[in-house]
Amino acid sequence: MTTSARTLLLLRHAKAEPHGKGPDALRRLDPRGWRQSAEIGAGLAAAGLVPELVLVSSAVRARETWEQVAGALGDGPAPEVDLRDELYDAGVEDLIGMLRDIDGRVRTLLVVGHEPTMSATAARLAGSGASGPMNQVRLGLPTAAYARLDVTGPWAGLDHLSAVLREVIRPA
């Protein structure tokens, strides 16, 4: 397996409707969330960060976030999408375990999930990075923000301090 650079994008779902009487997993995006998601998708495309594989939480708001992001990525090859129930309530170690199982041929991976797992995973994996992004992941990712990490080794080798946090991007 090659150890050339990989990119990990940890995206918190976009802004959702308030908690109501129904199950949390069924909350939908609100109008702001729809706009945020499309903006993030367009930004990923413009930055050349179109994923080859996307892991998406089965929660409605995460699926809707991905649908909007995907619609804004452009006309290139569609990423493989893996909808995962276990992402809904995954902790940091659970998510790192999922990431370790990713095929080594995948170079750019997007995870659409929830807080605090997205930011806590970025903080755990990041051995170094600029102080601004590190401070942001320590505080938590706002809705529709993503942490971009460079991973120099294989996915199977992901562990504490095994990636570099490059940036945190959030919609306007």
Which ranges hold each PLM region?
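Active-site-proximal alpha-helix that buttresses catalytic centers in soluble enzyme cores
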Residues: 2-88, 130-131
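Residue-level preference for the first positions of well-ordered beta-strands
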Residues: 8, 108-110, 146
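Glycine-rich phosphate-binding loop signature in dinucleotide/nucleotide-binding domains
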Residues: 47-49, 102-106
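Conserved histidine-centered catalytic loops in small-molecule metabolism enzymes
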Residues: 52-73, 150-172
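Alpha-helix N-cap/helix-start capping motif
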Residues: 59-63, 115-116, 143
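Short phosphate-binding loop-to-helix
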Residues: 86-104
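A glycine-rich beta-strand to alpha-helix segment
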Residues: 106-126, 134
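Domain-level recognition of soluble alpha/beta enzyme cores
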Residues: 126-166
